[in-house]
Swiss-Prot record:
Name the record gives this protein: ATP-dependent Clp protease ATP-binding subunit ClpX
Record GO terms (molecular function): ATP binding; ATP hydrolysis activity; ATP-dependent protein folding chaperone; protein dimerization activity; unfolded protein binding; zinc ion binding
Complex and partners: Component of the ClpX-ClpP complex. Forms a hexameric ring that, in the presence of ATP, binds to fourteen ClpP subunits assembled into a disk-like structure with a central cavity, resembling the structure of eukaryotic proteasomes.
Pfam families: AAA_2 (PF07724), ClpB_D2-small (PF10431), zf-C4_ClpX (PF06689)
């Protein structure tokens, strides 16, 4: 235990690891001869988590097992068990295919690119970001909305492979074993069912440009980013063993799926179609390739994405877990902000239920949670820096619904302040 001279500090306890006093931390845990603060405990847990991530259980071939990959995804992403299983198996098979290519020449194992379909805020991008943390192969994420056909303002599709090269420190051999996630893939859908006489340079044109690199070709990649340096030497990258995962919200696809096979009629004898009350994620489970064609993807592009995984709408329980359970959960973030004002922020359990219900009503998934939390805490965060001795702020369900103000608990007088709206 760290000792500091002076009569005022004789009874003050200090963390034996970081040296902070009991007044500078939330908790100080006592051992036989030492003390450790909550911040050092959290730091130790982070170190252990990192060690666990880097030591995934290996199967007989030295490959991470699908179950272990899925378990790591569970630590960071709430819900979506089916999508996690699909991704875990795909990554496991990707490793196996790479090992097989170096040992056998009899049967060539083709890759199975993946299409992730799910409502906005359901966790598609977060799943990809989590995969990037735990994989031993190079991984990169690209945004389909920035891509255009070659010769037009925007990024060429070869820039995706350039990002993969950068992720592998320009080691071409490693880059050729990597995984690419292309986000917002639904934004490059064809603008109409019928081919247009004008060029669709950011839609169908991009799909056609992606065909060869997704299937497997030797791409010429400009190491300095392409169009501004026409004299540079190109790197040759074989994309045959690069796994492509595409994700998108596909807004409007649920209507195409719901109306598939239904005949339309008019007049007095027309049959009245009942509205589909199913949630978006539930409808997505019934998706067929023909629905994607109607949405605006070209047949050749759909054919290069043989594995389709759909994500569910997040229900109230899942949204509540997202608020509190992950390492960077929203409630923990705001609690840390309030700690900087020496104030403890507490959410009642029923208040979290109301927040989750509001997010479901907004139909923005987990992304809507931050907006709701900001509106709840705005006035409190505005007033708090100018108030003295506020020890605790309590948020109840009425506060979330806008019926009352947060409850302020003061340290010295132990007074409670909270007025109804």
């Amino acid at each position: 235990m760290t000792k500091v001279g002076g009569s005022d500090s004789k009874n003050t306890l200090y963390c034996s690891f970081c040296g902070k006093s009991q007044h500078e931390v939330r908790k100080l845990i006592a051992g036989p001869t030492v003390f450790i603060c909550d911040e050092c405990v959290e730091l130790c847990m982070d170190i252990i988590r990192e060690e666990n991530k880097s030591s995934l259980v290996k199967s007989r071939d030295g490959i991470p097992t699908p179950r272990e990959i899925c378990k790591v995804l569970d630590d960071y992403v709430i819900g979506q068990p089916q999508a996690k299983r699909v991704l875990s198996v795909a990554v496991h098979n990707h490793y196996k295919r790479l090992n097989h290519a170096t040992k056998h020449n009899d049967v060539e194992l083709a890759k199975s690119n993946i299409l992730l379909i799910g409502p906005t805020g359901s966790g598609k991008t977060l799943l990809a970001q989590t995969l990037a943390r735990i994989l031993d192969v190079p991984f990169t994420m690209a945004d389909a909305t920035t891509l255009t056909e070659a010769g037009y303002v925007g990024e060429d599709v070869e820039n995706i492979i350039l990002k993969l090269l950068q992720a592998s420190d320009y080691n071409v051999e490693r880059a050729q074993r990597g995984i690419v996630y292309i986000d917002e893939i639904d934004k490059i859908s064809r603008k109409s069912d019928n081919p247009s006489i004008t060029r669709d340079v950011s839609g169908e044109g991009v799909q056609q440009a992606l065909l060869k690199i997704m299937e497997g070709t030797v791409a010429s990649v400009p190491p300095q980013g392409g169009r501004k340096h026409p004299q540079q030497e190109f790197l040759q990258v074989d994309t045959t063993n690069i796994l492509f995962i595409c994700g998108g919200a596909f807004a409007g696809l649920e209507k195409i799926i719901s109306t598939r096979g239904k005949t339309t009629s008019i007049g007095f004898a027309a049959s009245v179609q009942a509205p589909d009350d199913r949630r978006t994620g539930e409808i997505f489970r019934k998706v067929e390739p023909e629905d994607l064609l109607k949405f605006g993807l070209i047949p050749e592009f759909v054919g290069r994405l043989p594995v389709i995984a759909t994500l569910e709408d997040l229900d109230e329980e899942a949204l509540k877990k997202i608020l509190t359970e992950p390492k960077n959960a929203l409630v923990k973030q705001y609690q840390r902000l309030f700690e900087m004002e020496n104030t403890e922020l507490t959410f009642q359990d029923e208040a979290l239920n109301v927040v989750a219900k509001k997010a479901i009503e907004r139909k923005t998934g987990a992304r809507g949670l931050r907006s709701i939390m900001e509106s709840i805490l705005l006035d409190t965060m505005f007033d708090l820096p100018g108030l003295d001795s506020v020890e605790q702020v309590v948020i109840g369900p009425d506060v979330v619904e806008g019926k009352s103000r947060p409850l302020y608990i003061y340290a010295e007088r132990n007074e409670k302040s909270g007025t109804s709206a």
